Amino acid sequence: MSVKDFTQDLESFLAAFEERLRKVVKSEVEFIGLIEEDLVTAGGKRVRPRLVFLASAALGEVPHALELALAVELIHSASLLHDDLIDDAETRRGREAAFRKYGNAVSVLSGDYLLSRQMALLAQIGNLELVALCAEAARMLSEGEVLQFQVAALGEYSLANYERIIHGKTAALMQLACEGAAVLAEAPLAHREALARFGALYGQAFQMRDDYLDLMGSSEVLGKPAGGDVREGKVTRITLRLLEAYPEEVGAIFRRRGREEGDVRRLQELAQQSKAAEEVIQAIAERVEQAIGALRELPRSAARDQLEALAKRELVRLS
Amino acid sequence: MSVKDFTQDLESFLAAFEERLRKVVKSEVEFIGLIEEDLVTAGGKRVRPRLVFLASAALGEVPHALELALAVELIHSASLLHDDLIDDAETRRGREAAFRKYGNAVSVLSGDYLLSRQMALLAQIGNLELVALCAEAARMLSEGEVLQFQVAALGEYSLANYERIIHGKTAALMQLACEGAAVLAEAPLAHREALARFGALYGQAFQMRDDYLDLMGSSEVLGKPAGGDVREGKVTRITLRLLEAYPEEVGAIFRRRGREEGDVRRLQELAQQSKAAEEVIQAIAERVEQAIGALRELPRSAARDQLEALAKRELVRLS
């Protein structure tokens, strides 16, 4: 297949995805409809559906790839709705967070509605191994998010906890998107494992880059002021290094949740000066390289190249 | 089977249920463990597991009945955790609501954790029709809860909305408990339909009684002051009749959410005086009768008798 044909296939897959999503989340309850509109029109980058498409294309024909993309995206959307309470996010995909418009209650329950629609899709797909895989990803997602809350509340900062959190809250679903395609394709174990590894490592790099930019990015790129994680007491890989290197100064900044004028700027300075920033960029690069390495198990194809390109994009605009 | 043997079977089923529940919800994340303890030790009446047991016993042997009971109870428990945000409940099963101890965030995400464990159970049971049935019940549950919120927010009070709400928030899961057993037993359609009808009607009567007592019950029976629904702007069958009969006076009480001294007492008086209370008791009795009628499709058994007795209990302590 030529790259041009391939790109057209991706476009039509994503168009079909948007159309089906709109139908799947439709409810007779008006308040759910409001959330639904927010979700459907807000769009987002649809990273997970793209992963499902590319993983499927790399394997050849995969039955129910569209339904898998919908199921994964619905778990993701539900987690955004449930996680808005924690994050106290002022913006989410550039729009006012749903819970500010319609209240926490409707947000949480609409998230439950999306999860019920995801279960209906799984029943329709009719693959019990995929049900188990989704259950496992959803378990890691919720555990990762609770752990993040617990670590912030109790100050249990460690690299091990950070790794568990980013795997749970981001990488687990990316892995599901890729591995799920392999399950539906009944792919050989080596291909399934390769895609699972790719999804997990790519997801980790993705979240590490997000966390990096949360501190080091400009507010224009972020669409919100830098340092959001510090204000929520969330330690990321970069601030973990800073806490080790400057326990007193950075510890004090964390205890006051970066509330003093200049706190975030000071963390940025220390990150550059101590080379903590550089180190984290290096760690992301390694994760991207491992992800690409995992793909070597799959036969060369336009889709595999695209997965590689997707992973490499995590290295852009970091340094 | 004698009634004595039968009661022993129920006891051992419930004991096995508690033990498995403890294992199923176990998590390495400490904060989830706190919620879990609350849930496991708090117990509750386990109405849904009882229904699964009785429906299964009425059908003969049902594979995976215990796993079905766990799955249904986990959806119910998750909904309690997610619904605590709405209800602003001061007590839940006589204990401080989980979210007051550990925060809304942990509560919501721990609910998601329970839902993921429920999906894992479904994968283990391995029956795709049951996955579809659970998805449908979970959809109605979330839709019913959002609708309740919407109706309170917009004042869209009607009997039709009330019926949809009680079916969604309570009866759908009761129906799942009974119909799910029939699906696992591969029971004849007539038996499946009979159990589905019984579960739905019993669940409706159950919620109608709950709503009746919320206004008319003593605070000792309720374990909280009467009139909680009024304070949340929730119209139930009884207050719906009062709004029709005394639009100005009762309308004013609802608009101020029963905040004035004597408001709840006045509603109680009007309910007795206008016979609205009596009418609702009558409606509950009809629902119970229909539920028992549905059971007639099943062969007579100790389990069927117990289901009947369970339904009749909804008529106790009302008048």
Regions found by a protein language model. Name each.
Chain A
Residues M1-V24:
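N-terminal amphipathic/basic leader segments beginning at the initiator methionine
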Residues S2-F6, L39, S158, Y162-I165, ...:
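Non-transmembrane, amphipathic alpha-helical segments
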Residues Q8, E193-A196, D305-A309:
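Short, charged, amphipathic alpha-helical segments
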Residues A15-A16, R22-G251, E286, K312:
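Mg2+-dependent prenyl diphosphate-binding active-site environment of isoprenoid biosynthetic enzymes
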Residues M140, L201-Y202, R259-E260, Q273-S274, ...:
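A short structural micro-motif
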Residues E249-L298:
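Mobile late-domain/C-terminal helix-loop "cap" segments
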Residues R287, G293, R300-S319:
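Short, amphipathic C-terminal "tail helix"
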